[in-house]
């Protein structure tokens, strides 16, 4: 036999718990947001500045490559893609050399005289060996790829360092890693392109190195796991029994009549002077003024939020993340570069064939 009793539990406690769970979900929505919430405004600015130091070389060489592409495209001293103009330039070059030999001068003197003439000879010789405007445009594309990879590497490492180390240590590590990337880029540029003429293959190599570094950091940071609890996302005290499903999901019923609970007959002491209504079924007996021995509400469980991050001992390689965030940008840039270099190769082949015809005309076989 059960009794319907009124208790002092109000609906504001359930609303408070629901609001607390919603706040917890919103706060722990992302690993990066959670890690950055521990930083002050000054610390956040220092972390961003140390990260953006690595972006300076790619940004600088993007504008340098675009400026060189503009200058090469605007150079009109000689037009390589007009057969008549190239023929005239080669004819002028060989005529000067033949006149120098006819005057019984040495080859060195003739070459020096030809170079010191109008400057067309040296321009002709360097026209087939210098980079074209399209190569500098492709170089700016690979600078952009290197810029993206540098940012992605340091941004992923930043979350791990903020969680694992102190804020000052994380800032110092970010600054050191940025200097390492900048030093590597400048070292490759100074060794592979000392005269600043061969940017394209250098930045392709830099992007390949940064791709390998991105895979390494993806493996390194794979042991950082974000823990999100189920059913309220809180830990309950083990000394208190769990709440029933009706208590968790019955918020609407609690708003209508939040002072009604069900109790057993043994928990109620019925005084003898209270009037009870006759009931043939012998079921429920309404009590006017019952004295309840255990009328207090059950103790609410203590809530302990779990740690948001945890480090596991096993590291893995996330192939999906690497493919989407790393391989796809590099592959797209490689495809565009392939089309541009095929165009340059075709044009270069036409220039060499034209040079061969000129040499055969000026020096026919015997």
Curated annotation (Swiss-Prot):
It comes from the Eukaryota. The chain crosses the membrane at residues 137-157, 168-188, 196-216, 322-342. This is N-glycosylation protein EOS1. Residues 233-305 are annotated as: Disordered. Present with 937 molecules/cell in log phase SD medium. Residues 158-167, 217-321 are cytoplasmic. Involved in oxidative stress resistance and N-glycosylation. Residues 272-284 have a biased composition (Low complexity). Belongs to the EOS1 family. The keyword Repeat does not apply. It comes from Saccharomyces cerevisiae (strain ATCC 204508 / S288c). One of its GO terms (cellular component) is endoplasmic reticulum.
């Amino acid at each position: 036999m059960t009794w319907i009793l009124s208790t002092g539990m109000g609906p504001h406690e359930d609303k408070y718990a629901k609001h607390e769970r919603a706040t917890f979900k919103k706060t722990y929505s992302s690993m990066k947001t959670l890690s950055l919430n521990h930083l002050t405004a000054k610390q956040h600015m220092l972390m961003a500045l140390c990260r953006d130091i690595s972006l300076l070389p790619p940004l600088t060489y993007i504008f340098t490559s675009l400026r060189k592409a503009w200058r090469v495209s605007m150079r009109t001293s000689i037009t390589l893609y007009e057969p008549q103009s190239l023929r005239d330039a080669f004819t002028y070059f060989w005529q000067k050399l033949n006149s120098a030999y006819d005057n019984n001068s040495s080859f060195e003197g003739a070459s020096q005289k030809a170079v010191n003439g109008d400057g067309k000879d040296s321009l002709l010789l360097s026209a087939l060996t210098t980079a074209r405007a399209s190569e500098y445009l492709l170089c700016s594309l690979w600078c952009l790829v290197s810029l993206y990879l540098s940012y992605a590497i340091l941004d992923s490492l930043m979350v791990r360092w903020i969680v694992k180390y102190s804020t000052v240590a994380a800032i110092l590590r970010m600054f050191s890693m940025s200097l390492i990337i900048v030093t590597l880029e400048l070292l490759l540029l100074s060794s592979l392109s000392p005269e600043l003429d061969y940017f394209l293959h250098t930045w392709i190599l830099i992007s390949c190195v940064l791709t390998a570094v991105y895979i390494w950091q993806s493996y390194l940071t794979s042991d950082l796991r974000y823990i999100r609890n189920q059913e309220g996302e809180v830990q309950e005290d083990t000394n208190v029994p769990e709440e029933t499903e009706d208590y968790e999901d019955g918020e609407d019923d609690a708003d209508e009549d939040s002072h009604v609970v069900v109790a057993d007959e043994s928990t109620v002491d019925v005084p003898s002077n209270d009037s009870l209504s006759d009931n043939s079924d012998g079921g429920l007996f309404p009590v006017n003024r019952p004295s309840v021995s255990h009328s207090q509400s059950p103790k609410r469980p203590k809530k302990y939020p779990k740690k948001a991050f945890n480090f596991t001992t096993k590291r893995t390689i996330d192939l999906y993340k690497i493919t989407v965030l790393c391989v796809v940008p590099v592959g797209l840039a490689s495809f565009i570069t392939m089309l541009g270099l095929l165009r340059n190769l075709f044009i270069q082949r036409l220039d060499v064939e034209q040079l061969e015809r000129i040499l055969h005309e000026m020096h026919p076989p015997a």
